[in-house]
Amino acid sequence: MALGGMTTRALLLGVSIVSMGALVSETALAQAAAQAGDVQPQKPKPAKKKRAAAKPAAVPAQVANANAQASRSGQSLDEITVTASKTQERAIDALAPVSVVTQEQIQLQQPSRLSQLFYNVPGVWMQDRGDDPSTAINIRGLQDFGRVAVVVDGARQNYQRSGHNANGSFFLDPELIGGIDITRGPTANIYGSGAIGGVASFRTKDINDVLRPGERWGVDMSGSYGSNNNRGLGSVFGGVRVDPTVDVFGGAVYRTQGNYKDGAGTEIGNTGNDIAAGLMKVTVRPADGHEVKFGGLFQDYSYTIGQLNRGPTTTPALIALNQGSSVYASNAKNYTGTVTWKYARPEDMLFDFNVSLYGNRVDNDQTKTYHYSTAGTALCGAGSAGNNISGCVGDQRGYLLDTFGVDVNNTSRFNIGEWRNAVTYGFDVFNDKVKTFDSRGNSNITTPSGERTVSGGFVQLKTNYSSWLEVIGALRYDHYELNSSGTAVGVNNVSSSGDRLSPKITLGVTPVAGFTPYVSYAEGYRAPSISETLIAGGHASGGGPTFVTCADGTAGLFCFLPNPNLRAEVGKNKEVGINLKYNDVFTSGDSFRAKFNFFRNDVDDYIDLVASTPVLVNYVFMGRPGTILNSNFYQYQNIANAKIEGFEAETAYDAGLWFLGVGATVQSGKNTQTNVGLATIQPRKVTTTGGVRLLDRKLTISAQWASVAANTDLPAGYVPSTSYDLVNLYVAYQPTQDITLNFGVDNILNQYYRPYAIPGSTSDGTTQNDALWTAPGPGIVYKGGIKVHFGGA
């Protein structure tokens, strides 16, 4: 499935050339400046300023400038966001639990993984395996199978591979990111189908992230190095404004690291990886108010997943303690292409639209390099090892997902007296095609091939009266169709479909300036995934005895059963929130921002994997009879309702020379049928961030302390997460306008921490040591970096 390394190098070279192409000659720049002088009188700058003041739908450059001002003030809640209502508003003004991660924060923290960026964001966690560079995002205890809508430059990220890992992840290197918007809960239901947990919207870097005001071209070159173990990064991003109607931007990233040690000093095997990535964007403004952007993003991840045995495995006790897993040399390629057309003019109250077309491909090829025992010669041949679950050493398997989608929306505005009204309406469609290949293993059963189309349309009325009342009402229609196309093992043209209307209503008042309480009710709709619906066939025995023969003739430990009758999950979220926004609180120029939320999300028809009632099974293995109490069938079913409730707080005070912020989450989640806690809940997280700005703000020193409680209310057989206190230190120094030096220490206390619960064993009783051993985060990491800017007019 994957393309060769030559393609990777060629693409990265091309992107690098384009990004460095910003360093054009002085003659070309002079010509472009002359052309700009001819064009500018036709589109004077005062009109742009008027547009920004006239309505929130500002052009992207103005939004970037507004966000830059917010970043300089230290208030991420002053950033512009669109995820909650598809209309531009500052995060602090949104009547929704919205958080923003800025490029300034990313630059300060120098993260090697996305999870490092979300400690101070309430309600958000990441489930990382140390030997897998992809990321699974969890919002308010919901994750997997699309419960959180993840978009990169507007393109849905729906990749999913079932195994000893999260059922849904995505690939994105932090160095590529220009900003992140997070909306928690289904309050952003108009943003897209499936988001009963929330929306995570990632924006990759663009020309306004590199070029400064007045520059026609610019380049940022960055490099960093970290300990534990040889964490290296190099990147270059550059762009040129060819003329006032055309921008060209590109960049390339290379990252590498070796196996890290956890806080206990244990080296975590196969946690090293190599990542190469490149992006390209061309922006054209063919007419006043119109902007068309063509974007391309490519990422190449080379890594090894799986764990070697850590000791002898001669007895059941030693197997439980020391047995690893199969190991696979992995190469994942992620291709994303987008075309976006935006239009907005201040005098046009009828049209303010966005049209987005996108395609996303994840192509993950794996070759088995190690088996945890020497057994399997009957299946694999002399000198080889393996079993019929994971195949034999040297076998290949692959996971391919193609997603294509379109997202169209428009906002029309009208005023009636003191009532200011904005009607936003549109539709979105995406299609997933999954193709799984496994030469002798079980992956094509556990992650079946298939196709799914999900579509929806919405209308929203956002109305404001005077300066003290805001009401938002919305209605979304969702529809899905899913089929196996005859490709799933043991399934012949299984299909399912469904649809639903989901409402949203929000009411907010501002009785006094700066104080805005609000209440909200919103529903979200998540269609069943391909794997949940189509999984079918026998779970191979791994060389041991077989207990049951399935309908398709395969035999194994048990049979997976498809379920075309699965109903979609429906999230029903109740929210009470307060936004606080004050300036000049204690001293002139200081600012205080805060968002508080109380919520309860009732998820109806929650989908989970259910085992049949155990029965006695007689079997014969190697000529010896035996009897076992076995669950012969497993199937995804609508067996429970989930109730998740909690409190979130995000506060930030900035006095200019110093700043302090606290992000907190306290929540609980239950399967209401069994009254057992959900394994994906993180009960408590409090993160305090503070710092000072010295030397005329050239030097910033910041510390972050995350205090996290363990999740112990779990289904039977789960290994709890650990409680921990993670302390990080960051320093940024700008000796000149064009040079920025960064230093940091992650996990300065060198704590051992395992941030999420995992199953203690699989359904067949074998260990999940590969997941357990790779769950701990790195121990102490020292790191430093430099960014150099070049640019000119």
Predicted segments with their positions:
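C-terminal beta-signal and adjacent terminal beta-strands/loops
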Residues: 523-526, 532, 604, 609, ...
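Acidic, small-polar-rich N-terminal luminal/periplasmic segments of exported/outer-membrane proteins
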Residues: 42-212, 576
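Gram-negative outer-membrane beta-barrel transporters
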Residues: 430, 465-467, 471, 586-604, ...
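Membrane-embedded beta-barrel scaffold of Gram-negative outer-membrane proteins
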Residues: 223, 250, 352-370, 510, ...
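Transmembrane beta-barrel wall of Gram-negative outer-membrane proteins
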Residues: 225-256, 266-306, 331-342, 417, ...
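Structural signature of Gram-negative outer-membrane beta-barrels, strongest in the C-terminal barrel
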Residues: 285-287, 420-422, 428, 448-601, ...
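Outer-membrane beta-barrel translocator/receptor signature
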Residues: 159-164, 175-179, 184, 189-265, ...
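Outer-membrane beta-barrel domain signature, strongest for Gram-negative TonB-dependent receptors
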Residues: 273-423, 427, 590-592
